[in-house]
């Protein structure tokens, strides 16, 4: 048994069986001051007041929190970290006034990453992806959803997903794989979008399923990318092979993606920078988690999602990093939490729940992660002594992590 002692405040306590928070629940953060927490194997086995702490046995490892907080490790439910190289020239293009759409129309953006990935060996792609995972763990993230979508050919999409499978096996973090062949139309299919959709549905999805390479299927349903009808078809094809739907929608325009996501009982609908009351209404009483990506809004200078309005309407939201080389080159969930507070006007409690339990829900791992709950995996951050939960997004550049534990093991 491992015992974490002298915890200044244990934060993120959630009763067993609660898998997401919605509406007013988003302001609730269960906590216990002057606490201990025990770990058996990989899982949380108990916690309580320090004066009730069990006496450690000779085989037990004791971690003294020294008055720091213990919180659940962040869950990042939307990333594209399996990519090759960098795209800082596009960063300069944006500074010089080109829009995301203009860069894409010139052959940059996603297609640029697809070209780089095609020229990169599987071994090198694995090395680059693992380096990003290690970076994210060091910043407190313990679960990562990882998408394909920079292949855009059958061979390169499979290459990406095989790399993600290796990362899942080798990393201490919890990794979930999403097939995103419908991220853009492959360069070889320019002007033949329907043929590319046929390729995704009739060749890519069956091949991905045959190797068991993904849990989820995703589509970029937005202006200039894939239509509602195409999205509907691709999600149906994925579901026929047991893949659970997720969707990119409403980053560039109100695309109808939210409605098709709800139709398919998608686990999450992500981006939502541009939504109306119709989208909020469509999400009521659905299983679909609205997921917002403030790092992308920050980097691209586009509107932020209407997070506060979603919560006021009784919905939950998740926040994720969208870590990718073109529109959000960062996997720092603490900064995501800060942007949720600073730019989206979420309270620290709301932003915390959005980055932990609700993001765990949005990647299908809330039964095991995202909260301090007996029986869940011990993916934990032990902080340096800090005054409050609000300090984390408030002083968002001040180092706050003392230790990261994943599956009960001290990683960094």
Label the predicted regions.
Residues 7, 37, 42, 67, ...:
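Divalent metal-coordination and catalytic microenvironments
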Residues 111-128, 134, 142-255:
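Metal-coordinating catalytic core of metallo-dependent amide/deamination hydrolases
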Residues 61, 65-128:
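Metal-associated gating/positioning segment near the N- to mid-region
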Residues 244, 254-371, 383-387, 396, ...:
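Active-site-adjacent C-terminal substructures of enzyme catalytic domains
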Residues 137, 201, 209-210, 239, ...:
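Non-catalytic positions within long, well-ordered alpha-helices that form the structural scaffold/packing
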Residues 1-56:
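N-terminal metal-binding scaffold of metallo-dependent hydrolase/deaminase domains
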Residues 21-26, 357, 377-412:
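C-terminal cap of metal-dependent C-N hydrolases
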Residues 3, 60-64, 177, 404:
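Conserved beta-strand scaffold positions in the cores of enzyme catalytic domains, especially
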């Amino acid at each position: 048994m491992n015992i974490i002692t002298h915890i200044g405040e244990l934060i993120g306590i959630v009763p067993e069986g609660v898998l997401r928070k919605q509406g007013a629940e988003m302001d609730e953060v269960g906590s216990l001051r002057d606490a201990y927490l025990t770990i058996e194997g990989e899982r949380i086995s108990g916690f309580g007041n320090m004066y009730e702490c069990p006496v450690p046995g000779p085989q037990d490892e004791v971690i003294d929190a020294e008055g720091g907080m213990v919180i659940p490790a962040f869950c990042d439910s939307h990333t594209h970290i399996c990519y090759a190289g960098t795209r800082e020239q596009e960063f300069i293009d944006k500074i010089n006034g080109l829009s995301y759409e203009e860069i894409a129309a010139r052959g940059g953006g996603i297609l640029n990453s697809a070209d780089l990935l095609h020229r990169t060996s599987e071994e090198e792609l694995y090395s680059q992806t693992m380096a990003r995972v290690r970076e994210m763990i060091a910043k407190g993230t313990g679960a990562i959803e990882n998408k394909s979508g920079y292949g855009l050919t059958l061979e390169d999409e499979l290459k990406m997903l095989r790399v993600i499978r290796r990362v899942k096996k080798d990393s201490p973090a919890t990794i979930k794989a999403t097939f995103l062949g419908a991220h853009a139309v492959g360069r070889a299919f320019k002007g033949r979008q329907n043929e590319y959709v046929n390729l995704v549905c009739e060749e890519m999805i069956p091949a991905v399923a045959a190797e068991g390479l993904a849990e989820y299927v995703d589509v970029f349903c937005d202006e200039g990318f894939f239509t509602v009808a195409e999205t509907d078809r691709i999600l149906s094809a994925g579901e026929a092979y047991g893949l659970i739907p997720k969707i990119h929608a409403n980053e560039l325009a109100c695309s109808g993606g939210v409605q098709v996501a709800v139709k398919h009982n998608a686990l999450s609908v992500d981006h939502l920078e541009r939504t109306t009351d119709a989208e909020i209404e469509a999400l009521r009483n659905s299983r679909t988690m609205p997921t917002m990506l403030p790092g992308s809004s920050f980097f691209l200078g586009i509107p932020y999602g209407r997070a506060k309005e979603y919560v006021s309407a009784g919905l939950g939201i998740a926040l994720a990093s969208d870590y990718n080389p073109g529109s959000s080159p960062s996997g720092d969930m603490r900064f995501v939490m800060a942007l949720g507070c600073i730019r989206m006007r979420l309270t620290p409690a709301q932003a915390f729940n959005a980055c932990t339990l609700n993001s765990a829900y949005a990647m299908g791992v809330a039964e095991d992660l995202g909260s301090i709950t007996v029986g869940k995996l011990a993916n934990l951050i032990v902080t340096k002594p800090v005054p409050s939960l609000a300090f984390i997004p408030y002083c968002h550049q001040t180092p706050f992590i003392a230790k990261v534990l994943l599956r009960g093991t001290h990683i960094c």
